[in-house]
From Swiss-Prot:
Residues 37-514 are annotated as: Ligand-binding A region. Residues 194-514 are annotated as: Fibrinogen/elastin/tropoelastin-binding. A motif (LPXTG sorting signal) lies at residues 929-933. This is Fibronectin-binding protein A. The lineage of its organism: Bacteria, Bacillati, Bacillota, Bacilli, Bacillales. Promotes bacterial attachment to multiple substrates, such as fibronectin (Fn), fibrinogen (Fg), elastin peptides and tropoelastin. This confers to S.aureus the ability to invade endothelial cells. Promotes adherence to and aggregation of activated platelets. One of its GO terms (cellular component) is extracellular region. Residues 933-965 form a propeptide. Residues 1-36 form the signal peptide. It comes from Staphylococcus aureus (strain MRSA252). Residues 515-837 are annotated as: Fibronectin-binding. Residues 548-607 are annotated as: 2 X approximate tandem repeats.
């Protein structure tokens, strides 16, 4: 073979290879450019909703950090379903965007899917991750979060609920871990079923049952007994825990009210425990959420108890008991009922049986009874509402019963068991037209001869919104006389019995007419801060006003009788109406006999189961009980006073002010001014605003603004201090010394007399005052704060003369610092502070050197242009020792990305990493891909490939010429 031919073959091969290789380079560089554009695109979501995109290939470390920033803030995961088309379609409920990802789940594709998930963050919702139940293919769960974020969130629980669904619902849903955790917490926040803590309640020996007016109780005068419990609870009470106690069956807590409920125990407007009336005389109090973290809980419980007319039907002694945790508290009382009004022929008595303010209805029982066999002729009994009548109301229901029991067997308590046929016989139908009932609430009943005992049961309504209700039972008749003589017609008589209900609502003292009735359910406790410490106390005894749902009008019941139309009153009371909606009822009885005037006293006390609370609570969190802790105490005893009229319309309108002086700062105390707003139910609302304090002391007291309170701020934090309490005076921060120089902001606290001196290369005079000179050098101190007390002389000397500054103050604090952000010290003597600097130079940080020796500045190596360099924090060292700046290798920040004309640098921070962007307006996110930064290298590669191809073509062409030759 010829040499030239062999050479041509080699050139042919070389030329063809060059053309092929160059073409592949050109094509490959173009494909590489597209891959770089999609692979490195990550989105950093800022708190303001804007995003910064970084596409620089070389900045992989920063890109990873930014992705982790997103993951640590909001972590997402999705379930991907494999489809037969070998592609996974990932969508979210918020936006119908789809991203095609291969089954192999390459890292670049994971990043792409992750970006879409982050973009959908605008309206995150908790969704159920479900798995298909059809035959569309197997499923697997793909975690789309980077590994670092997954490691940081191992503790988070991914909750997935599997439910059947159709093939149309094959799209996987994205579930946010944090939202699932919140939903789980919400589901766990169920109402805790409490436990019976009755066994954890101790009844103190001071507990008792007593009557306010001695041991003789007259229920018809509105008198009642009071259960006074002094209880102590073990620690660890929880929401829902309850305790029970049982009352004897001869008393109840409601009186004539229809509602069977005891009032709640309140702390102001906060319900500490809810009261409930159970069967068989059991009372239960269930603690609410406010009992949490309360320790040393004690309760002084006072509850009004009313004599039950059904159980106690006659006069005599009664033993009233209450049993709690096996301990019985008891009291023995003499019960005495009123006899009503009577003459030698007939007796009339009556009572309000029930009163329902919600339905505006009441029931009344009246006795009509001949005395000693003395019958009467032509007797007419009428019942009517003289006040509170509803003209457009419905007809009342009136039942007439004949008493068929033993003689004198009617209950003295004026109680009618209408279902007991052995005692009462219903004769309503036998009366026929003798009984007439009107729509205005009145009735009339005629007897030709009254020779039997009758019980009249009345059920009617009264006018809604009326302020007073008075029901009158009146009997007129003539003594039985066989001969109708002149004496007979002039010897008629009239008996009148009024049951008056005075509905009143006031903001004063709800005392009954016998004086104060205080239901002080004092609730005392200490506050547990949760870390085992108990600090401070809030000591307040409150009597709280309870509001009624529809009508907060308590009731006062009066009874009036008159004979022969003559004047005069015999005053008395029979019952008190008690309702849980703060409506108490007082019952008055007034009678008069044969024109004899007089006033026999006896007024009903109106009361309500007010459940005031006495409690102690922490007002200073995590504070030790020093002189700066102020304790508050409130008064539980309401002021007295009442206004009465003959109509027994009792309206109390007063504001009694009481002050209690209790513990305080060493030489001043606080006075808690409590205004008591009460209703008849003795419920007093105390409005207490803790932030307001009042001072009072024996000596002169001045308002305290800042009590030797010093606050120093610096980069390292805040220091607070309290001086000793001496003479309390108003102090303002008037001794603040600031020293400004080229090195930054400097301040100091010094005691005694000080002088500050700064020397340069030139000799300067030195100023010294006092002894115990302490040299303090300030060299490259970024920031020092402080306050100076007493007199200070501050001088700063440079190349030019500087004036001297003098400041007045009180105490002294000095600082000795060197290359430290903040160091504090304190000295008692006089100090001299020297500060050495070098001649004026550009403001660049200096390398610390020995005190007094000027050191030339060390130039700082600038970072690459266009790349921001994060500041290097200085490391604190011991005072007075220079510390060279720590050598820290600067981290490469991300290259700023152009967004319009705004450059958004992304800086990595050691703490929770977030993208840091300059202040700017919100911009719409651009959809096109930004510049990737790899264009220059790509163009060079393409140029190289092109040249390579041209060279190959030239070789091929030359080879052809050789063949021709």
């Amino acid at each position: 073979m010829k040499n030239n031919l062999r050479y041509g073959i080699r050139k042919h091969k070389l030329g063809a290879a060059s053309v092929f290789l160059g073409t592949m380079i050109v094509i490959g560089m173009g494909q590489d450019k597209e891959a770089a554009a999609s692979e490195q695109k990550t989105t950093t979501v800022e708190e303001n909703g804007n995003s910064a995109t970084d596409n620089k290939v070389s900045e992989t470390q920063t890109t990873t950090t930014n992705v982790n920033t997103i993951d640590e803030t909001q972590s997402y995961s999705a379930t991907a379903t494999e489809q037969p088309s070998n592609a996974t379609q990932v969508t979210t409920e918020e936006a119908p965007k789809a991203v095609q990802a291969p089954q192999t789940a390459q890292p670049a594709n994971v990043e792409t899917v992750k970006e879409e998930v982050v973009k959908e963050e605008a309206n995150p919702q908790v969704k159920e991750t479900t798995q298909s139940q059809d035959n569309s293919g197997d499923q697997r769960q793909v975690d789309l979060t980077p590994k670092k974020a997954t490691q940081n969130q191992v503790a988070e629980t991914q909750v997935e609920v599997a439910q059947p669904r159709t093939a149309l619902e094959s799209k996987p849903r994205v579930t946010r871990s944090t939202d699932v955790a919140e939903a789980k917490e919400a589901s766990d926040a169920k109402v805790e079923t409490g436990t019976d803590v009755t066994s954890k309640v101790t009844v103190e020996d001071e507990s008792k049952i007593e009557a306010p007016k001695g041991n003789n109780v007259q229920p018809h005068e509105g008198q009642r007994v009071v259960l006074k419990y002094k209880l102590k609870f073990q620690d660890g009470l929880k929401t829902g825990d309850y305790f029970d106690f049982t009352l004897s069956n001869n008393v109840n807590t409601h009186g004539v009210a229809t509602t069977r409920k005891v009032p709640d125990i309140k702390n102001g407007s906060l319900v500490m425990a809810k009261g409930q009336v159970l069967d068989n005389g059991r009372i239960r109090y269930t603690f609410t959420d406010y009992i949490k973290d309360k320790v040393n809980v004690t309760a002084n419980l006072e509850i009004n108890l009313f004599i039950d007319p059904k159980t106690v039907q006659s006069n005599g002694q009664q033993t009233i008991t209450s049993k709690l945790n096996g301990k019985e508290t008891s009291g023995t009382m003499q019960i005495t009922y009123k006899d009503g009004v009577k003459n030698q022929y007939t007796n009339v008595n009556g009572s309000i049986e029930t009163f329902d303010k919600e339905k505006n209805k009441f029931t009344h029982v009246a006795y009509i009874k001949p005395i000693n066999g003395n019958n009467s002729d032509s007797v007419t009994v009428t019942g009517m509402l003289t006040q509170g009548s509803n003209e457009n109301g419905t007809q009342p229901n009136v039942k007439i019963y004949e008493y068929v029991g033993v003689e004198n067997g009617l209950p003295q308590s004026v109680y009618a068991n209408t279902v007991d046929s052995t005692q009462l016989k219903d004769v309503t139908n036998q009366m026929g037209d003798k009984l007439k009932v009107q729509n205005n609430g009145s009735y009339s009943l005629n007897f030709d001869k009254l020779d039997k005992t009758y019980v009249i049961h009345y059920t009617g309504d009264y006018l809604n919104g009326t302020s007073e209700v008075n029901f009158r039972t009146q009997l007129t008749g003539y003594p039985e006389n066989r001969y109708k003589t002149y004496y007979y017609y002039n010897n008629g008589y009239t008996l009148t019995w009024d049951n008056g209900l005075v509905l009143y609502s006031n903001k004063a003292n709800g005392d009954g007419k016998y004086g104060p009735i205080v239901d002080s359910n004092n609730f005392e406790f200490s506050e547990d801060s949760g870390n085992g410490s108990i600090s401070g106390q809030y000591d307040a005894k409150q009597i709280i006003e309870t509001e009624e749902n529809q009508d907060n009008t308590p009731l006062d019941i009066d009874y009036h009788t008159a004979i022969d139309g003559e004047g005069g009153y015999v005053d008395g009371y029979i019952e008190t109406i008690e309702e849980t909606d703060s409506s108490a009822i007082d019952i008055d009885y007034h009678t008069a006999v044969d024109s004899e005037a007089g006033h026999v006293g006896g007024y009903t006390e109106s009361s309500e189961e007010s459940n005031p609370i006495d409690f102690e609570e922490s007002t200073h969190e995590n504070s030790k009980h020093h002189a700066d802790v102020v304790e508050y105490e409130e008064d539980t005893n309401p002021g007295g006073g009442q206004v009465t009229t003959e109509s027994n319309l009792v309206e109390f309108d007063e504001e009694s002010t009481k002050g209690i002086v209790t513990g305080a700062v060493s030489d001043h105390t606080t006075v808690e001014d409590t205004k008591e707003y009460t209703t008849e139910s003795n419920l007093i609302e105390l409005v207490d605003e803790l932030p307001e304090e009042h001072g009072q002391a024996q000596g002169p007291v001045e308002e305290i603004t800042e009590n030797n309170h010093h606050i120093s701020h610096s980069g390292l934090g805040t220091e607070n201090g309290h001086g000793n309490y001496g003479v309390i005076e108003e102090i303002e921060e008037n001794s603040h010394v600031d020293i400004k120089s080229e090195l930054g902001y400097e301040g100091g606290q010094n005691s005694g007399n000080q002088s500050f001196e700064e020397d340069t290369e030139e000799d300067k005079p030195k100023y010294e005052q006092g002894g115990n000179i302490i040299d303090i050098d300030f060299d490259s101190v970024p920031q020092i704060h402080g306050f100076n007390k007493h007199n200070e002389i501050i001088e700063e000397d440079t190349n030019k003369d500087k004036p001297n500054y003098q400041f007045g103050g009180h105490n002294s604090v000095d600082f000795e610092e060197d290359t430290l952000p903040k160091v504090s010290g304190q000295n008692e003597g006089q100090q001299t502070i020297e500060e050495d600097t070098t001649p004026p130079t550009p403001p660049t940080p200096e390398v610390p050197s020995e005190p007094g020796t000027p050191t030339p500045p060390t130039p700082e190596v600038p970072s690459e242009p266009g790349k921001p360099t994060p500041p290097t924090p200085e490391v604190p060292a011991e005072p007075g020792k220079p510390v060279p700046p720590a050598k820290e290798e600067p981290k490469k920040p991300s290259k700023p990305v152009e967004q319009g004309k705004v450059v958004t640098p992304v800086i990595e921070i050691n703490e929770k990493v977030k993208a840091v962007a300059p202040t700017k307006q919100k911009q719409a996110k651009k959809s096109e891909l930004p510049e990737t930064g790899g264009e220059e290298s790509t163009n060079k590669g393409m140029l190289f490939g092109g040249l390579f191809s041209i060279l190959g073509l030239a070789l091929l062409r030359r080879n052809k010429k050789n063949h021709k030759a």
